[in-house]
């Protein structure tokens, strides 16, 4: 950021995100799995802009809908949840919650969450495993030292129409396996959750190298840094 946007010396500092302080209070529920995909700008543009789809029925023909709905009703998943005595909470991005009733549950083991009953940070803190796609909430989950996987069945379209690829490579830098098919997703989920949340050492190593600050002083550091910048600007 400093090099690309020409910030002056001292303006860019490694301080940690304030919201991460609360994550140290996490109490994980071993029976709870969280699936939390991000939105798609071509389906639900911000500020009510026009997308490719104008109704719930049209969205149900999209690759996005089919990818996630097929996963939620996969018989292997439903049987696995029953056998392992687990529950999966599916929580959509707020931009996708503009379409109530879009996704359906075919099992009491799968809960389609609505924002009025659930808090995002609490879900992250409580859940033992995360299935996401491109969402930055994977950072929060990895920060807590918990396993996850990325489900990116529409990778090419997402990069073309939503966000171009940046400095972070999911394959090289991600905190869990990248799955491009439902088969790969089910296999990764079962391999981890079915073996007492086992994960490969390389993902633990990536977490340790990425999160160099792991304490409850993020708010304090940010407050002190802002105060110092304000002080220096007044004196300058």
Question: Where would I find each of the regions flagged by the language model?
Answer:
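Active-site-proximal region of nucleotide-activated glycan assembly enzymes
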Residues: 1-22
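Catalytic binding pocket for nucleotide-activated donors in carbohydrate/polymer assembly enzymes
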Residues: 7-9, 103-107, 134-210
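Short, well-ordered alpha-helix to beta-strand connector turns
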Residues: 9, 30, 85, 126-127, ...
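Hydrophobic/aromatic beta-strand patches that form the interior of the parallel beta-sheet core
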Residues: 13, 34, 89, 111-113, ...
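Short, solvent-exposed loop/turn segments at secondary-structure junctions
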Residues: 18-21, 38-42, 93-98, 117, ...
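Conserved catalytic-core segment of nucleotide-activated headgroup transferases in glycan assembly
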Residues: 18-102, 179, 214, 218
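Donor nucleotide-activated moiety binding/catalytic core segment of transferases
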Residues: 94-139
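C-terminal alpha-helical cap of glycosyltransferases
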Residues: 215-236
């Amino acid at each position: 950021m400093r090099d690309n946007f020409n910030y002056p010396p001292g303006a860019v500092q490694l301080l940690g995100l304030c919201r991460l302080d609360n994550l140290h209070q996490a109490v994980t529920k071993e029976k709870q799995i969280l699936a939390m995909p991000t939105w798609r700008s071509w389906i639900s543009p911000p500020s009510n802009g026009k997308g490719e789809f104008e109704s719930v029925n049209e969205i149900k023909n999209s690759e996005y809908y089919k990818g996630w709905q097929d996963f939620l009703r996969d018989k292997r998943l439903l049987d696995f949840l029953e056998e392992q005595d687990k529950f999966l909470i599916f929580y959509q991005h707020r931009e996708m919650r503009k379409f109530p009733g879009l996704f359906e549950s075919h099992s009491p083991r799968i809960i389609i969450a609505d924002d009025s009953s659930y808090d995002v940070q609490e879900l992250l803190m409580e859940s033992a495993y995360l299935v996401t796609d491109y969402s930055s909430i994977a950072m929060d989950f990895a920060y807590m030292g918990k396993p996850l996987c990325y489900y990116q069945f529409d990778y090419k379209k997402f990069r073309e129409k939503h966000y171009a690829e940046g400095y972070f490579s999911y394959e090289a830098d991600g905190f869990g396996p990248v799955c491009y098919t439902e088969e790969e997703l089910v296999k990764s989920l079962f391999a981890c959750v079915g073996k007492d949340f086992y994960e490969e050492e390389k993902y633990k190593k990536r977490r340790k190298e990425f999160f160099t600050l792991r304490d409850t002083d993020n708010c304090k550091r940010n407050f002190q840094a802002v105060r110092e910048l304000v002080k220096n600007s007044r004196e300058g």
